[in-house]
């Protein structure tokens, strides 16, 4: 008779839910005040002019205008600004 011993239980098989991070509004896009521009962990992007930074480092528009991405400073940091139209 063909017999097989029962397999042990596994401790794998779980994964956390995706957090939907990333850029939500791209360069040149028109935004309204309060619009979320980037959801991020830490400051991959820094807040420039007319951009606020939330408690979880979410960047959002403080005024209406167009999104502008720029690289500034000796450390080549990425800044996001809102340029009034």
Curated annotation (Swiss-Prot):
The keyword Repeat does not apply. GO terms for molecular function: structural constituent of ribosome. Coiled coil: none annotated. One of its GO terms (cellular component) is cytosolic large ribosomal subunit. Residues 1-20 are annotated as: Disordered. Signal peptide: none annotated. Keywords: Ribonucleoprotein, Ribosomal protein. GO terms for biological process: translation. InterPro entries: Ribosomal_bL27, Ribosomal_bL27_CS. The keyword Ribosomal protein applies. SUPFAM superfamilies: Ribosomal L27 protein-like (SSF110324). Belongs to the bacterial ribosomal protein bL27 family. HAMAP family: Ribosomal_bL27. This is Large ribosomal subunit protein bL27. The lineage of its organism: Bacteria, Pseudomonadati, Pseudomonadota, Gammaproteobacteria, Enterobacterales.
């Amino acid at each position: 008779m063909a017999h097989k011993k029962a397999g042990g239980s596994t401790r794998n098989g779980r994964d956390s839910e995706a957090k939907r991070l990333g850029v939500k509004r791209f360069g040149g896009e028109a935004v309204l005040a309060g619009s979320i521009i980037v959801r991020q962990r830490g400051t991959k992007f820094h807040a420039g002019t007319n951009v606020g930074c939330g408690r979880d480092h979410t960047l959002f528009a403080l005024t209406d205008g167009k999104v502008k991405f720029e690289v500034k400073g000796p450390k080549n940091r990425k800044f996001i600004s809102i340029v009034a139209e």
